[in-house]
């Protein structure tokens, strides 16, 4: 059974540049069949995560223009990450504590992958999955 984030993550993750538009991000999400993209700066460092929900709620529903709004303008605050060699238990604690559905995986200060709920469901114990679901979505 897998024991580290590196073992269950989806690798080869593509970033959206912080200066690229939200429209570009939406097209890339559709092309890749994903619901979120890491936002990377010109220095290749992780700046945030952009989700399809961010695009709908923070741009479209707010009357913004997806063709002019940059991905970087939506990736605010501190990015929650996990180390590639951190345990699945630590990964579950981090997802629960920060109520996140996707967790970027960092190795030597570089993005190497992302762990999603589906990665977790495929590789974690049922107890670990329940812990994350309760942390992210509540006990109700």
Regions found by a protein language model. Give the residues of each.
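Non-catalytic alpha-helical scaffold/packing segments enriched in small hydrophobic residues
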Residues: 24, 54-55
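C-terminal structural segments of small proteins and small subunits
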Residues: 118, 122-125
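Flexible, gly/ser-rich surface segments that form the specificity/activation loops bordering the active-site cleft
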Residues: 59-60, 124
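Ca2+-coordinating acidic residues in Ca2+-binding motifs
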Residues: 54, 73, 119
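Bateman/CBS regulatory modules and CBS-like beta-alpha motifs in cytosolic regions of diverse proteins
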Residues: 1-28, 34, 39-42, 46-47, ...
């Amino acid at each position: 059974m897998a024991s580290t984030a590196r073992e269950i993550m989806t690798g080869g993750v593509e970033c959206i540049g912080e200066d690229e538009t939200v429209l570009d991000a939406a097209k890339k999400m559709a092309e890749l069949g994903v619901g979120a993209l890491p936002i990377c700066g010109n220095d290749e460092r992780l700046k945030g995560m952009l989700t399809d929900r961010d695009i709908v709620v923070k741009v479209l529903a707010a009357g913004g223009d997806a063709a002019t709004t940059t991905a970087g303008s939506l990736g605010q605050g501190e990015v929650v990450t996990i180390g590639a060699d951190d345990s699945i238990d630590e990964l579950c604690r981090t997802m629960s504590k920060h109520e996140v559905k996707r967790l970027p995986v960092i190795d030597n200060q570089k993005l190497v992958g992302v762990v999603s709920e589906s990665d977790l469901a495929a590789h974690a114990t049922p107890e670990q999955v329940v812990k994350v679901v309760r942390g992210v979505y509540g006990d109700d």
